Amino acid sequence: MKDFESLKFQINELVNKELEVLNLKVYQINNLKEFENDMIQILVEDSLQANKPLDFDILIKANDLVSNKIDQLIKTKDKYLLEISSSGIEKQIRSQEELLKALEQWVYVQLNNEIKKVKEFEGYVTKYNDQTNTFTFSFFIKGQKKNLDVKFDDIKFIRYAVRF
């Protein structure tokens, strides 16, 4: 879609405002090609509980709330598809603020460098120490419980995970 990057901020603001009534917020906005049409994909999450599963009914309500307003904002004769979807149960945690919302949640973590002989793990985010700016993770390696204090900058990649 032409000028998508210039519209992205406006779409984000508009959608966040409209979805407040459903306790939803934008996680990410993408412009994709689907067959020969442009697609605007808006990934949303619960604004109160970041990793709360969203059901199909609430996504339909979200689509109904924003569809016409986005048409008015974009004002294009080109055809495009609008998709409102959940950001997913294993979505990436992209910032320290998002990680703070993941306290007591099960996550998958890759570190930039080994810390105490650990480079990656799955475990709980158990606490945050604002004085040392570190998160404590609790996990098991070979049946042994481990706790690891990590600064957000030492994390290469982190996402929510499903514990089996």
Swiss-Prot record:
This is Ribosome maturation factor RimP. It comes from Mycoplasma mycoides subsp. mycoides SC (strain CCUG 32753 / NCTC 10114 / PG1). It is found in: Cytoplasm. InterPro entries: Ribosome_maturation_RimP (IPR003728), RimP_C (IPR028998), RimP_C_sf (IPR036847), RimP_N (IPR028989), RimP_N_sf (IPR035956). Gene3D superfamilies: Ribosome maturation factor RimP, C-terminal domain (2.30.30.180). Its main location: cytoplasm. Keywords: Cytoplasm, Ribosome biogenesis. Required for maturation of 30S ribosomal subunits. Belongs to the RimP family. CDD domains: YlxS_C (cd01734).
